[in-house]
Amino acid sequence: DMAQKRLDDAMKLGATRVINAKEKDVLKEVEAFTNGVGIEKVFETAGSPVTIAQTPYLVKKGGTITLVGMAADPKVKFNFGQIMAKEARIESVFRYRNLYAKAISAVANGIDIGMVATHEFDFEHIQEAYEAAINDKENVVKAVIKL
């Protein structure tokens, strides 16, 4: 990702390594800490054309790339030759599809969503909620609108 708060939160939630793609050369970082082997599971969450295009070079042979981030321009350069040579798999996630029931169950069972639901807004302030989510991506992970 490119938002440091999100990366910090990922570490608190159990990630073993994260890389801020705005600050570091992701390819060099991954090569160094995997001794050139690559990553078993690559999750691209930023939705940046640059970070999406890097994923074939990050995944290890037989690994999996999961594309979560949505690029503003749907046309992104992607090296399928690298994917084929590594026999890697590509998965995509359309954000929240089929997750509502699981999310409701998790919250009902006591999971703490405080790190994810970082901001709450009353319905009357819906415009403010959208503006915060769009303009303050560094701090707003998810904005909750109370009905």
Which residue ranges define each predicted feature?
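Glycine- and other small-residue-rich loops at beta-strand/loop junctions that grip anionic moieties
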Residues: 19, 40-45, 68-69, 92-93, ...
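Rossmann-fold NAD(P)-binding glycine/threonine-rich loop
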Residues: 69-87, 103-105
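Glycine-centered, small-residue-biased loops immediately flanking beta-strands
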Residues: 63-64, 88
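Helix-to-beta-strand junctions that scaffold the AdoMet/dcAdoMet cofactor pocket
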Residues: 59-61
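Residues in the short beta-alpha loop(s) of Rossmann-like NAD(P)-binding domains
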Residues: 3, 71, 96
